[in-house]
Amino acid sequence: MSKMGSSSMGELQDGITQEDSIEKKSKNVASHGEKRKVKRKKEDLSMDGSNDGVKDSPDSNDDSQSKKKKKKKLKKSQQPLNEENYPRLQTTENNLQKPLKISDLQELVFWCLADGQAPSWVLVRNKQMIHRAVILLVPGLEPSQFGFQPVRGNKHSFLLPNLLNENGPIQLPDFCEVFDRAWPTRSPGDRFRVFSPVNAFLQSPLSNEQKKKRDKETRAMASFSKPSDYLMSYESFIEDEYPLHPTVMKGEEVTQPSGWVASAGDFHSPPINPKILAIDCEMVRTENGLEIARVTIVDMKSEVIYDEFVKPESPVTDYVTQYSGITEEKLRNVTTVLSDVQSYLKKTVDNNTVLLGHSLNSDLNCLKFTHPHIIDTANIYNHTRGPPSKPSLKWLATKWLRREIQKAGALGHDSAEDALACVDLLKLKVKNGPAFGLFNQDFESIFHRLSRQQPTPLIGAIADYGNPESCIGKAAHKSVSCANDDEVVSAVVSLSDMHNFVWGRFRELEHAAMWNANRNTKQENNSDTDTENDSVEEDQVTSYSSALERFNRRIRLLYDSLPKGSLLLLYTGTGNPIEMSKLNAIRQQFRKEYQTKKWDELSVKWTDEENMKYISAVENTRNGLSFMTIK
């Protein structure tokens, strides 16, 4: 029997004609509100079947339907925006029973642009028409400015006020037109700390698939790990402000400053089987700043090969014994000077030598010695919060070596003990591989995650103060350095034309609100000082009010300049941190003095009462805000 006959008979045996099949599908789909799609599908199928009156095979029909769905979906995403397909956010006051987390904001971005899950707290209409997301960190705004104050355990405090109902600051009329609600948003942290709101947004959790891939690569790399794998890069030298060796300057002719010495040799290739020397120095304060008072060098056999006290060139003003372990008595008869140490280093350290240490940049700067092959344990191990925070050597020794160091208290540190700890930390790292001792390994840059999207990778950019490319913007397609908020606006608008995801940060409100200022914790009783303080506070209020007005204009300009189909999301990161910072300064001062002074000699006290106040201040600081809209 011919293929045509076979198909027709099979269709009759099933008791289903082509028209019956179409009608059945139409009814089924129409029940879900898609009558228009079914009508087009019916017409297309009728035309396809008019040539031979025979239904295609099931496989070919599925392929055809799949292709048509993809074409229609693509055509729909390319439609011009109108009232019917315009993307928008839909919510009610009762949607929120607790504050959002910054990770919730991140998931909203992934849902709109990539492979995220639908959020439960907001409905995104026509999300296929959203083509980019612009995120701004805007510290300096507080919940109380928008008519509410979130309180944990009280769900009514999270109801969302409408900004247009006289809840927003009078300086923000345009802002309140662009955004209709303020969303209470809680920063990550614990009882005593507020974690970085920058990392919270720009780092994304790894999927299980990515974790398996990472673990497989880690196991493979561990068996081939060697010390040279952990040499610092040129970029790390710059970022950590290491003194640069002439050969590191990429061919540029460099003259060593007076008094400085560089290691000699051919450094065009890394050492294959290097001699590794751990070095640690103790310093004292002199009339000309910090100077070397002791130098210790330990080899990889854990043997001390050099340990000398050094006579400072300038008069000592503070032996800082509680940190350095140096006393006047220890330096009294010392004749070794810095140039003697430099001569030893130049003789001992060559092109096959790697210098090892913890935050070795400070040691080398005091030694006035440069060398291009460096391993820094502060870089090859992570702080628990991840980069850019650096771990202390004491914490690394406790965590990974199960060893207590620097516990002499008032007697200070021991440079030999610190150098030995660095040796053991490197041995442990080489044994276990590059991923050992790193935190945030279950996270990746949001820019990496977006770039893996299929079928079209999404590209991200960043605009921030300073040099974002050296830190938070390393993984971004493009990073723009800005000097003020106006430059941030210009950069974000420009970047949004060619990028799917743009992150930026405003700083003016934060400065005007004194969020990042060091507050004086002491109260003065002088009446003239009180009058002066009142005047300063009035100036600060005026300055903040003016900053709000400029912020309002920038948001209007930014919103008007963005392309249609843009998700614009602002978050403050935290609430007001001033009280927390003030108490934390007292807390740190107490900890510092408690190590070396008697109780009645302490300049500050830290009791249970201060501790509870501090915990409460941290809690309040974690209460931030976010604002979102779609243009």
UniProtKB/Swiss-Prot annotation:
SMART domains: EXOIII. Keywords: Exonuclease, Hydrolase, Nuclease, Nucleus. One of its GO terms (molecular function) is exonuclease activity. Residues 1-19, 517-526 have a biased composition (Polar residues). One of its GO terms (biological process) is rRNA 3'-end processing. Residues 527-540 have a biased composition (Acidic residues). One of its GO terms (cellular component) is nucleus. Residues 1-92, 517-540 are annotated as: Disordered. This is Uncharacterized exonuclease C637.09. The lineage of its organism: Eukaryota, Fungi, Dikarya, Ascomycota, Taphrinomycotina.
